[in-house]
Amino acid sequence: MQNGWRGLQKREVVQIAALKVDDDFNVVAEFNQLCQPKINLILSDYFVNLTGISNDDVAQKGVDFASAYQRFKAFVGNDVCYSHGWNGAFEDACDGAILAENLRLYGLPADNSVKYRNIAALFKQVYQKYNVAVSSQSSGQICKILGLQQQLADLHLDEHNALYDVYSILCGVRHFADDFAILKQK
């Protein structure tokens, strides 16, 4: 796969992050796990600069993908996992498809136990409702587009770090809380 990071490489997951929130969109639990790549053993400078995750971080705090995925599944439990893919529909798996790709990549059994939904489709509807002009966005850009990035300053992270990105999604959901009330029913 051609990817701008370092020629032809597999899309190995290096970080999985997720939040659990209550009905008022307050964080009740946080999941953040680094994964040690098995194929692309050295993270490219592009990736390190993009995410702020270093090779030392992965070596010291990372676990193999299979362990990280099992921990992630345990964290999610029976809840719906909302991820973000700008060009996808609400029913699309988005990040779930990347996790499934990594299961295949590592020869692990397919797993459909986690239910994924694409929250970007809801953001598009809300942006249209409030005339927020956005032609595309990544999950980490949500709080910046809304001028709310100061709310995430204490994370000391930036866009494309998965933990920052999930907090950025939550920042947007909180900003438009009434419009995202549908998430409480899922």
Question: Could you describe each region identified by the protein language model?
Answer:
Residues 1-100, 144-146:
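Conserved non-catalytic scaffold segment of RNase H-like nuclease domains
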Residues 1-3, 121, 168:
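Short, glycine/acidic-enriched loop or turn micro-motifs at the edges of active sites
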Residues 8-10, 82, 111-115, 134, ...:
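Short, surface-exposed helix-loop/turn micro-motifs enriched in polar/charged residues
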Residues 24-26, 105-112:
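Short helix-capping segments at alpha-helix termini
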Residues 35-42, 46-51, 55-58, 120-166:
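Active-site-proximal helix-loop-helix substrate-binding element of RNase H-like nuclease domains
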Residues 77-98, 102-103, 132-186:
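Acidic, Mg2+-coordinating catalytic module of metal-dependent nucleases/exonucleases
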Residues 109-124:
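Conserved beta-strand -> loop -> alpha-helix junction used to position metal-binding or nucleic-acid-contacting
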